[in-house]
UniProtKB/Swiss-Prot annotation:
The protein's name in its UniProt record: Recombination protein RecR
Gene label: recR
Zinc fingers classed as C4-type: ranges: 58-75
Lineage: Bacteria, Pseudomonadati, Chlorobiota, Chlorobiia, Chlorobiales
Keywords assigned: DNA damage, DNA recombination, DNA repair, Metal-binding, Zinc, Zinc-finger
Cysteine pairs bridged by disulfides in the record: none
Function field: May play a role in DNA repair. It seems to be involved in an RecBC-independent recombinational process of DNA repair. It may act with RecF and RecO.
Family as reported in the entry's similarity comment: Belongs to the RecR family.
């Protein structure tokens, strides 16, 4: 059943486009917005606009960063091990590893994985940018690349593709330990398990 208000239906449809949000949840969110004070709704609207206007991708690691902070704080930190790069699918995995307080290297965010069924190929994710960071012409010093992609078919395909590109460059390519359940998403794995997975990484 649809609401008679076109504005309500339009907001429900927009909420329902978000990952993991079905129509029922979208309806609840819409009702919440309707019941909130105007000032709170305006703050939400402003935050949505700000995140599109003031957040960019780091020119080095492709992680998200505020406009005016490029390269990002992780890439410019003097306390990171610059010889190791951990490759992840999205910024949420960077946050997950940082929460462990265990990994001290750098990151590279692919913003996706190879998925032929979805029409996503190597050129559609940030593989080229990764290669540029560790090519012989780069300022690098990178000795190890850790593949920390989700244990899915697409993640495995992407890991294999990247490892084949990196091995001829003499880079030590490793992957996090297989204690992560197949099909699980790294952003939802607890810190202790992620730390053990990083410690137990093995050569590809």
């Amino acid at each position: 059943m649809r609401y008679s208000s076109g504005a309500v239906e339009a907001l429900i449809e927009e909420f329902a486009k978000l990952p993991g949000i079905g129509r029922k949840t979208a309806q609840r969110l819409t009702m919440h917005v309707l019941q909130e004070r105007r000032g709170e709704v305006e703050k939400l609207a402003a935050a949505l606009i700000d995140v599109k206007e003031k957040v960019v991708r780091c020119s080095i690691c492709q992680n998200i960063t505020d406009l005016g902070t490029d390269p990002c704080l992780l890439c410019t930190s003097t306390g990171r091990d610059r010889s190791v790069i951990c490759v992840v699918e999205s910024p949420t995995e960077v946050l997950a590893f940082e929460k462990t307080g265990h990994y001290k290297g750098l990151y590279h965010v692919l913003h996706g994985v190879i998925s032929p069924l979805d029409g996503v190929g190597p050129d559609d994710i940030k593989v080229r940018e990764l290669l540029a960071r560790i090519s012989p012409d780069s300022e690098g010093g990178v000795r190890e690349v850790v593949l920390a992609l989700n244990p899915t078919v697409e993640g495995e395909t992407t890991s294999l593709y990247i490892s084949k590109l990196l091995k001829p460059l003499g880079i030590n390519v490793t992957r996090i330990a297989r204690g992560i359940p197949v099909g699980a998403e790294l952003e939802f794995i607890d810190e202790a398990t992620l730390s053990r997975a990083m410690d137990g990484r093995s050569a590809v």
